[in-house]
Amino acid sequence: MSPGSVLKTAPGAYLSGFGNEFATEAVPGALPEGQNSPQRAPFGLYAEQLSGSAFTAPRRENRRSWLYRLRPSANHPAFQPLAQGLLRSGPFDEVPASPNRLRWSPQPPPAQPTDFVDGLVTYAGNGDAASGAGISIHLYAANRSMVDRVFFDADGELLIVPQAGRLRLVTELGVLDVAPGEIAVVPRGVRFRAELPEGQAAGYVCENHGAFFRLPDLGPIGANGLANPRDFLTPVAAFEDVDRPTEVVQKFLGRLWSARYSYSPLDVVAWHGNLVPYKYDLARFNTINTVSFDHPDPSIFTVLTSPSEVPGTANCDFVIFPPRWMVAEHTFRPPWFHRNVMSEFMGLVHGVYDAKAGGFAPGGGSLHNCMSGHGPDRTSYEQAIQADLKPHKIKDTLAFMFESRWVIRPTRFAMETPALQQDYDACWAGFQKAKLP
């Protein structure tokens, strides 16, 4: 929390559900009853609609919230360009796209005081914000809270995956406390401040320029399973009444812009709607897997999906590989060898990924683009084909994947950083040729 600010919060901490119409007020009586924009809002608050979709979008796709705030959002000076450091957006054409398998070691923590915004580094992406399609993949590393500084992204919604250190996201609509093993999603345009309760934090961000993340259809799985709606948590209303200079940074068409407000814009006293920030504990994921034979397709591990115009072919799927029982009979249990029309960026929150015995460390990443062969390394393969196939639980692990229908293009930084493992291809060296009779 910024020095001297007092956050006033509604009773309780979170509202349960995914895609719900929520209503919450930090001060009793602040939320108008029966209409959105009365002639005079309670207490002289300003009624403001935040639209995340076109007015005429189908109801099932329509996202908007009504905010009741101390000052209108329009009350601010002009924004000025701000140095963007290593933050990038599409089109990702700094360097030629590479068909090679790529893997990165974790980056060292920052040596200088660095907050969440300054600590964002773009590794790869596709599409671009102007087209309303694609994703940008960033890593963050920070060692100080944002103080008298607020950020919002006009280019897309942010799916944040903490890897080390908790984040406290103080948003316009309330507070999200997010720890490693959880995720948070902040909608396009929602302003927030990232605080570091433990003094340091690192993790991953998927900036989604396309359709909203939503729960995947379950098909024959039925009405329950995977990520259940009740386990998603949206914050209750919270606001601060601060008349002190505050820097507001926005990302707009790939560039950062800054304006100096005379107050904190985190001043929404009450709100209702369905365009909301939310968090989810990945330990609540109801993992589906085989109880007979073979390794099912990894789509069974999808937490959230951003669809494209092609049915079943995602702009981005967010997939996890959590602790789970492996019981398949007469089966090669790790993920099999694969060439995929989709492109895959993987990260590791903690533990060891079951298809890589070494080299893939928490805080690192890997990229396997369209039709690049990948799969278990030789050590993992040899262990798996000789394993005693009794029931086995994979414990203390959490890997994830951002999968996209479009080629994921690395940035110049990602291709030139010393963290890029030049020997990654060697993990597939030494496989013996099969011997035919």
From Swiss-Prot:
Active site, UniProt feature: H295 (proton acceptor)
Record flagged with keyword Iron: yes
EC identifiers of the protein: 1.13.11.5
Pathway per the UniProt entry: Amino-acid degradation; L-phenylalanine degradation; acetoacetate and fumarate from L-phenylalanine: step 4/6
Residues binding homogentisate, per UniProt: Y353, H374
Pfam families for this protein: HgmA_C, HgmA_N
Coiled coil start-end: none
GO cellular component term, pick one: cytoplasm
GO biological process: L-phenylalanine catabolic process; tyrosine catabolic process
Family: Belongs to the homogentisate dioxygenase family.
Name of the molecule in the record: Homogentisate 1,2-dioxygenase
Lineage of the organism: Bacteria, Pseudomonadati, Myxococcota, Myxococcia, Myxococcales
Gene name of the encoded protein: hmgA
